């Protein structure tokens, strides 16, 4: 049975597990042999032109399968207009490269949904570390988003995302992806093997 960690800042605990390791541009300048996502986090915007140039360079690396984290965060120091510029550019790069978008969103759900309606992406948009309630989860799924869940989650939201819109992650937490799988499968009253099989199918779909 293969476990997929769709978003992490750590190397996998078990070498046989599949992980997409997040890299903050431009701090990761070498190919690693692992799957990677590269992105400009809304907390760490300091030079838009320079960071976007580096993002464009790195997205061409063969180990890069996603752009992110990127997104909108009303608690971040960077102005929302600046965040929007980065986000739109990141979404465009993801479209051109044919890789999925890993999204960080805090208190900007209306703006995020509006962006998706406007940009009409063909590649998957995945909201990482989703902790919102079932109502918000259902709204996002109806708009075509995928949700990724980690150590903390709302069971009702997990049920909304199951089966075809759900992923699992460890993010920056000191937790094994296998524990996340177990917790999510228990919340759905499913056998671990059934849960893992569906997540594997979801990964193949993106």
Residue ranges: model-predicted function:
Residues 1-206:
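Mid-domain alpha/beta scaffold segments of enzyme catalytic cores
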């Amino acid at each position: 049975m293969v476990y997929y960690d769709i978003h992490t800042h750590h190397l996998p605990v078990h070498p046989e597990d599949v992980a997409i390791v997040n890299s903050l541009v431009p701090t990761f300048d070498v190919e690693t042999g692992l799957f990677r996502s590269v992105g400009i986090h809304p907390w760490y915007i300091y030079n838009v032109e320079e960071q976007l140039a580096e993002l464009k360079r790195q997205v061409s690396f063969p180990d890069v399968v996603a752009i992110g984290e990127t997104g909108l965060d009303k608690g971040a120091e960077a102005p929302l207009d600046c965040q929007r510029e980065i986000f739109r550019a990141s979404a465009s790069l993801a479209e051109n490269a044919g890789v999925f978008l890993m999204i960080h969103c805090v208190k900007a759900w209306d703006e995020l949904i509006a962006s998706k309606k406007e940009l009409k992406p063909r590649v998957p948009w995945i909201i990482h570390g989703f902790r919102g309630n079932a109502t918000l989860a259902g709204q996002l799924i109806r708009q075509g988003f995928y949700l990724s869940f980690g150590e903390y989650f709302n069971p009702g939201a997990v049920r909304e995302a199951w089966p075809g819109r759900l992923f699992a992650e460890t993010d920056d937490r000191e937790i094994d992806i296998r524990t996340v799988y177990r917790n999510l499968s228990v919340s759905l009253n499913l056998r671990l093997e059934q849960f893992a099989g569906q997540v594997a199918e979801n990964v193949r779909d993106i």
